[in-house]
């Protein structure tokens, strides 16, 4: 009898790193590349606003995207202080918007009153390092979740469905903050930030391994409205989805070329936040 050797399984192809392939190129601020990660921060001017584009490739986003937080219900912290909790990160941005005596608004469908939520993120689900801090049953979730298979955006999902995927982290803000879904704008034309120029931190997912961060500053003659940001991201990158993280004085963009280096501030970082999103090798 003739026996054919069992064919070896094909190796899983390495997903493409798109950092160098986008048509839009700004002036390089810094870049970092390793076997598992590639990012480059670029300075651009868009409609009079000085902005930073951070192009990111991650081999395994489910483990390389990280979160650090302030103390639940007790305080908010400077982003660079929270980053000290993630020693292997080389890049971070600010994360969730939060409730405080200064920003006390909570949605009308949240149980309780604003002081019940002080110094915690907006959003009906909060998970940090796999630990559940909040689940408002029946209150739709508008935010991000990180699971073993990567980063996901939720647009009004049931908290039970979000938690069923066993997220390790969440980040969230206003219900209007998912602004692009399935390559289409879902920006609410009546949201006050749609037409108000502001400093912003926005994350776009190109595919499961490639992301674009847009950091909008007030260093130029103007900031950008959310409509300007969405139009720009769609025309330049056509993202799968886009989510608006905390903005205004809360923006932060920092990098370091190795975990042994001190953090370098690119933008923001001067106000305290509830949490950060970091990227590690």
Regions found by a protein language model. Give the residues of each.
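Short, solvent-exposed aromatic-acidic interface loops
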Residues: 69-74, 157-162, 215-221
């Amino acid at each position: 009898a003739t026996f054919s050797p069992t064919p070896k399984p094909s190796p899983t192809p390495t997903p493409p790193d798109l950092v160098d392939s986008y048509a839009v190129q700004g002036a390089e601020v810094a870049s970092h590349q390793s076997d598992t990660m590639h990012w480059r921060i670029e300075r651009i001017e868009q409609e009079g606003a000085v902005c930073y584009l951070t192009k990111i490739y991650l081999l395994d986003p489910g483990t390389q995207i990280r979160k650090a937080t302030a103390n639940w219900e007790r305080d908010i912290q400077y982003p660079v202080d929270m980053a000290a909790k993630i020693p292997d990160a080389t890049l971070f941005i600010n994360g969730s918007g939060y409730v405080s005596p200064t920003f006390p608004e909570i949605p009308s469908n949240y149980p309780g009153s604003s002081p019940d939520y002080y110094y915690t993120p907006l959003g009906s689900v909060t998970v940090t390092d796999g630990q559940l801090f909040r689940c408002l049953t029946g209150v739709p979730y508008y935010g991000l979740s990180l699971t073993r298979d990567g980063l996901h955006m939720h647009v009004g999902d049931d908290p039970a469905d979000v938690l069923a995927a066993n997220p390790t982290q969440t980040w969230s803000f206003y219900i209007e903050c998912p602004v692009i879904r399935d390559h289409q704008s879902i920006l609410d034309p009546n949201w006050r930030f749609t037409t108000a120029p502001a400093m912003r931190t926005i994350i776009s997912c190109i595919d499961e391994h490639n992301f674009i961060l847009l950091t909008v500053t007030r260093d130029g003659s103007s900031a950008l409205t959310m409509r300007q940001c969405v139009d720009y991201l769609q025309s330049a990158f056509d993202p799968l989805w886009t989510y608006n993280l905390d903005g205004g004085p809360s923006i932060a963009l920092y990098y370091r070329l190795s975990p042994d280096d001190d953090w370098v501030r690119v933008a923001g970082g001067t106000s305290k936040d509830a949490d950060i999103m970091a990227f590690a090798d």
